[in-house]
Curated annotation (Swiss-Prot):
Quaternary structure (record): Homodimer.
UniProt protein name: Thioredoxin reductase gliT
GO molecular function, a single term: thioredoxin-disulfide reductase (NADPH) activity
Enzyme Commission number: 1.8.1.-
Disulfide bonds: 145-148
TM stretches of this protein: none
Annotated organism of origin: Aspergillus fumigatus (strain ATCC MYA-4609 / CBS 101355 / FGSC A1100 / Af293)
Gene behind this protein: gliT
Induction line: Expression is induced by gliotoxin, but appears to be independently regulated compared to all other cluster components. Expression is positively regulated by the brlA and abaA transcription factors. Expression is also regulated by rsmA.
Pathway participation: Mycotoxin biosynthesis
Essential cofactor(s): FAD
Biological function: Thioredoxin reductase; part of the gene cluster that mediates the biosynthesis of gliotoxin, a member of the epipolythiodioxopiperazine (ETP) class of toxins characterized by a disulfide bridged cyclic dipeptide. The first step in gliotoxin biosynthesis is the condensation of serine and phenylalanine to form the cyclo-L-phenylalanyl-L-serine diketopiperazine (DKP) by the NRPS gliP. GliP is also able to produce the DKP cyclo-L-tryptophanyl-L-serine, suggesting that the substrate specificity of the first adenylation (A) domain in gliP is sufficiently relaxed to accommodate both L-Phe and L-Trp.
Keyword annotations: Disulfide bond, FAD, Flavoprotein, NADP, Oxidoreductase, Redox-active center, Virulence
Family assignment from sequence similarity: Belongs to the class-II pyridine nucleotide-disulfide oxidoreductase family.
Cofactor notes: Binds 1 FAD per subunit.
């Protein structure tokens, strides 16, 4: 089975260009392969969970390295199916060729690739806190998701929640704190110098049906984080000289969609900075462009990414099989 149509300029035309080879992109490719549709999956080698040794809450893959899942998915696609090609390169630009309703993607080596549809599975970049030591502790003591991490450190005496950035409001801070309380005897909520926010969170906790039992509130500025010597502990240095050791910290950071493609294609975005899509097939505001995985949902985890990719494949298949292949003309440049 051919992996695409070779054009007169030497470029490859496939049904779908998939930008990203994480769980979402691989899942999309699998669905397309099952209907003998052609696709190129572009793998930049950049993954949000690259620092993570184990993934969790993934059926059948619990406590396995996420690299194993990616490798297995890629192996399935290359050994069992013949219509999917992988390209280890970074796409730098995408545009729609208006004259023929195709899409052109250009990689970091100057090669052009053409597809009838595009799937953005680029993932996101976590925006770090501007506090010394944060990056060293990220994913190794500071966790963004307590379904993904934390269970292995259960039974702590104390853990911390950082009510900063997107978590700097009572509802989100208390949600994470209550999840953390399942794994620890007490939870300290840090507001990094914001005394008013600390009061608001405390008041909301005390007035809630479950109360504030087990919760502590720390409004002093955080000077720096330091990785502890034991397990996933993090030392939080406060004010001038005091410090507190936590079993681990919880913080869900602001994220930024990887790549320039949302801007290049003029896609609509959500208030949270994700690509806006329409379920159940996750097509964006530009017809023919789909977005799946972390770049298109606030629920940034492996299982939702796989689900989104599978559903997007269903939408892609329906469109591809209902639309005639447009005539191809090379009359525009990026």
């Amino acid at each position: 089975m051919s992996i695409g149509k070779l054009l007169s300029n030497g470029a490859l035309l496939v049904d779908v260009l998939i930008i990203g080879a994480g769980p979402a992109g691989l899942s999309t490719a699998t669905g397309l392969a099952r209907q003998l549709h052609t696709a190129v999956v572009f793998d930049s080698g950049v993954y949000r969970n690259a620092k993570t040794q184990h993934m969790h809450n993934v059926l059948g893959w619990d406590h396995r390295n996420p690299a194993e899942l990616r490798a297995a998915g890629r192996a399935d696609l290359t050994t069992r199916y013949s219509t999917i090609q992988f390209q280890n390169s970074t796409i730098e630009a995408i545009r729609q060729v208006e004259t023929n309703q195709l899409f052109e993607a250009r990689d970091n080596e100057g090669h052009s690739w053409y597809g009838r549809k595009v799937v953005l599975a680029t993932g996101v970049r976590d925006i770090p806190l501007d506090i010394e030591g944060y990056s060293e502790c990220w994913a190794n003591g500071i966790y963004h998701c307590l379904f993904c991490d934390g269970y292995e450190e259960r039974g702590q005496e104390t853990v911390g929640v950082l009510a900063l950035g997107p978590i700097a409001n009572p509802a989100r801070a208390l949600h994470l704190a209550r999840m953390a309380l399942r794994l620890s005897e007490s939870v300290t909520i840090y507001t990094n110098g914001n005394e008013q926010l600390a009061k608001e969170i405390q008041q909301a906790a005390e007035e809630s049906p479950v109360g504030a039992s087990g919760l502590k509130f720390e409004a002093r500025p955080i000077r720096r984080f330091e990785k502890g010597d034991v397990a996933k502990t993090v030392i939080v240095h406060l004010g001038e000289s005091e410090s507190k050791t936590e079993g681990f910290l919880v913080y869900n950071p602001q994220t930024e969609v990887n790549g320039p493609f949302a801007k290049q294609l003029a896609l609509n975005m959500t208030e949270g900075g994700d690509i806006l899509t329409t379920p159940p097939f996750y097509e964006t505001s530009v017809p023919g462009v789909f977005a799946v995985g972390d770049c298109a949902t606030p629920l940034k985890a492996v299982t939702p990414a796989v689900s989104m990719g599978s559903l997007a494949a269903g939408g892609l298949v329906a469109q591809l099989q209902a639309q005639a292949l447009p005539e191809f003309r090379l009359d525009q440049e990026l």
